[in-house]
């Protein structure tokens, strides 16, 4: 939380607030509430349902346009009902990370407790053994009230309180009328000498009706007024169904969705004789300074000539830890200056924008010699820090394969973190595969070429390169396509180098994309080359079916694609899963072989998944080939609308 000092209170029916002390400081961003509805048995059915929740709920929430998911898993008495809501100003990647961390924190801070609520800055999580009504009145069950320790001064308090009430009510109105996200942010001009602006944020769960959302927020406004939060320098009331927040500094991402004018400014005082004298004095100073301009320009020219050398020196110094001299030499040749990239992208203009992810924004650029590049400009608030940047640089600079994206250069000037890659005209696989119109560009030949190319790229990483590398974040959006739809694996920020005799690593920092993670990695932090094999299996099924790894698929349940594929495979109906846009223009035996390989790659035990060299052998084989037998994969089923009252 971006605050100097906040005090908290829990208005939680049957919930205990776990805090070692108040006030809450910057280091404490998590507020867990542990319920008293009973405990579950470790390794029992309810515990297993929580584990399924951990692997699936982050995907469902982060892939939703509203960054919201609710549902249930299992049957009574071990059914678990879950709800996750990410703040409307966050992005999909940050949403998935926050929800996953909240689930993990819930189990660590409220061990074996059936009902838990976790409030984080960017997401809210609740799971319990009973459904949670879609009602404003249910918001007080597990509510947290937090306020800034400092009051505003008595001189401005009346005007400040009136401004806060006006702002939070207007923001609440905006959020209630947002039919997709039920989210709003606002700012109001106040007083240049004390608080230039006041900022606010309001949000409800998107499954609430507009009137119910506004009623829920109205209750919070009342609590803020009666509790004298509006006279503080900041305050928030957090509930599972709705929340409201105001500060005297911008605390949300992006521009405010609404702006309110402040009080009319006082008229400027008339110009006095003293003012005229001051103006004349400034003119005299300017006239005296003019002869020095030539000297200043000469100094600037000398500085400019040394800039390129210093840029390279800075980049090498930034990346020097844990890097050998050879690595640094290979990196130094990749340094690009910021002005070149600004010129190439028209100063990072919107019309050059290709897309946006959890790291920041990607732009199309044109270098002076005519080369087209993709410029990945990491946001200042990006989770991808200097270590991830260093990993990507030092790995990609050493790798050379037709199915891996090629790094063109890097820029670290002025606190920027920018990577430039070869430009891929067809962008990422997900932009075609999950687009109802563009998917028609991919006939079976193109799809099989993409599957083959990804498999060859992974074999190079795992077995054939001078390094043994686990990518850890293989997914459709990290597979780029050139003009001929040849695939290239990209984004090595999470990649890890393995020793040649190393088979498995355990990490406490689980990073990647839920839905593509293997069970042993998502649940226990264990990863190996077989993590990438699992992700590849998911990709194969997505490419063949044209479907994401999660969705309703015409039923009253949200299920993952692995589950749907397995059910069709064991019923000898796998042919029904093939993307309808292919028509009948595909070789049935080859498609079924690819489905078999996809299911083989998502086997629950890592040892049962093939090496990528074996996958490539299976893909390139002709005629009848006996493939290994399959076991039932891991998957999760979520009932739609299960949290409705």
Swiss-Prot record:
SMART domains given in the database record: S_TKc (SM00220)
UniProt xrefs under InterPro entries: GNK2 (IPR002902), GNK2_sf (IPR038408), Kinase-like_dom_sf (IPR011009), Prot_kinase_dom (IPR000719), Protein_kinase_ATP_BS (IPR017441), Ser/Thr_kinase_AS (IPR008271)
This protein's UniProt keywords: ATP-binding, Disulfide bond, Glycoprotein, Kinase, Membrane, Nucleotide-binding, Plant defense, Repeat, Serine/threonine-protein kinase, Signal, Transferase, Transmembrane, Transmembrane helix
Keyword Membrane among record annotations: yes
Gene Ontology terms: biological process: defense response to bacterium; immune response; signal transduction
Record: glycosylation sites: 39, 91, 151, 169
Signal peptide (from-to): 1-27
Superkingdom field: Eukaryota
GO CC list: plasma membrane
Membrane topology listed for this record: Single-pass membrane protein
Enzyme class: transferase
PANTHER family: CYSTEINE-RICH RECEPTOR-LIKE PROTEIN KINASE 10, RECEPTOR-LIKE SERINE/THREONINE-PROTEIN KINASE SD1-8
Family, per entry: Belongs to the protein kinase superfamily. Ser/Thr protein kinase family. CRK subfamily.
Full protein name: Cysteine-rich receptor-like protein kinase 10
């Amino acid at each position: 939380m971006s605050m100097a000092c906040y005090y908290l209170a829990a208005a939680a029916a049957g919930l205990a607030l776990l805090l070692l002390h108040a006030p809450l400081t910057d280091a404490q961003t998590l507020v867990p509430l542990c319920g008293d509805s009973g405990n579950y048995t470790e390794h029992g059915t309810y515990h297993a349902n929580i584990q399924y929740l951990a692997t699936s709920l982050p995907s469902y929430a982060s892939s939703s346009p509203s960054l919201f998911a609710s549902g249930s898993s299992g049957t009574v008495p071990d059914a678990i009902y879950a709800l996750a809501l990410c703040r409307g100003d966050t992005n999909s990647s940050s949403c998935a990370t926050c929800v996953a961390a909240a689930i993990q924190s819930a189990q660590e801070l409220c061990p074996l407790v059936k009902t838990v609520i976790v409030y984080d800055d960017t997401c809210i999580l609740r799971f319990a053994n009973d459904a949670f009504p879609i009602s404003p009145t249910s918001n007080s069950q597990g509510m947290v009230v937090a306020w800034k320790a400092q009051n505003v001064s008595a001189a401005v308090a009346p005007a400040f309180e009136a401004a806060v009430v006006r702002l939070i009510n207007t923001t609440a109105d905006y959020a209630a009328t947002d039919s997709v996200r039920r989210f709003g942010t606002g700012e109001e001009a106040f007083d240049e000498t004390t608080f230039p602006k006041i900022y606010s944020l309001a949000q409800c769960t998107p499954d609430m009706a507009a009137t119910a959302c506004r009623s829920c927020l109205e209750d919070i406004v009342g609590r803020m007024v009666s509790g004298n939060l509006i006279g503080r320098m900041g305050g928030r009331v957090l509930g599972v169904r709705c929340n409201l927040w105001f500060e005297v500094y911008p605390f949300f991402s992006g521009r405010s969705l609404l702006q309110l004018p402040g009080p009319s400014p006082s008229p400027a005082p008339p110009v006095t004789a003293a003012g005229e004298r001051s103006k004349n004095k400034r003119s005299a100073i300017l006239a005296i300074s003019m002869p020095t301009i030539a000297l200043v320009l000469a100094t600037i020219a000398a500085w400019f000539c040394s800039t390129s050398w210093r840029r390279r020196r800075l980049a090498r110094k930034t990346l020097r830890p844990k890097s050998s001299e050879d690595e640094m030499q290979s990196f130094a040749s990749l340094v690009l200056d910021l002005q070149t990239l600004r010129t190439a992208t028209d100063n990072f203009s919107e019309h050059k924008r290709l897309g946006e992810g959890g790291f920041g924004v990607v732009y199309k650029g044109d270098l002076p010699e005519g080369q087209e590049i993709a410029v990945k400009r990491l946001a200042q608030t990006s989770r991808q820090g200097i270590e991830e940047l260093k990993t990507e640089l030092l790995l990609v600079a050493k790798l050379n394969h037709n199915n891996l994206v090629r790094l063109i250069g890097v820029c670290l000037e002025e606190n920027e973190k920018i990577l430039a890659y070869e430009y891929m005209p067809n962008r990422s696989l997900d932009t075609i595969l999950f687009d109802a119109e563009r998917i028609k560009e991919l006939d079976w030949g193109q799809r099989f070429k993409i599957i083959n190319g990804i498999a060859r790229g992974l074999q190079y990483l795992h077995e054939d390169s001078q390094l043994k590398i686990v990518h850890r974040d293989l997914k459709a959006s990290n597979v780029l396509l050139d003009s001929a739809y040849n695939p290239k694996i990209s984004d090595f920020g999470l990649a890890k180098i393995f020793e040649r005799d190393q088979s498995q690593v355990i990490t406490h920092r689980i990073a990647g994309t839920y839905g593509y993670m293997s069970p042993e990695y998502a649940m226990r932090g264990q990863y190996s080359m077989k993590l990438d094999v699992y992700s590849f299996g998911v990709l194969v099924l997505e490419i063949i079916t044209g479907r994401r790894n999660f969705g309703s698929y015409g039923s009253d349940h949200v299920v993952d694609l692995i589950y749907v594929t397995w059910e069709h495979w064991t019923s000898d109906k796998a042919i029904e899963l093939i993307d309808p846009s292919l028509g009948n223009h595909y070789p049935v035996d080859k498609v079924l072989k690819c489905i078999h390989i996809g299911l083989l790659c998502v086997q629950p035990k890592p040892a049962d998944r093939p090496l990528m060299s074996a996958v490539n052998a299976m893909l390139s084989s002709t005629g009848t080939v006996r493939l290994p037998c399959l076991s039932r994969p891991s998957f999760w089923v979520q009932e739609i609308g299960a949290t409705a009252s």
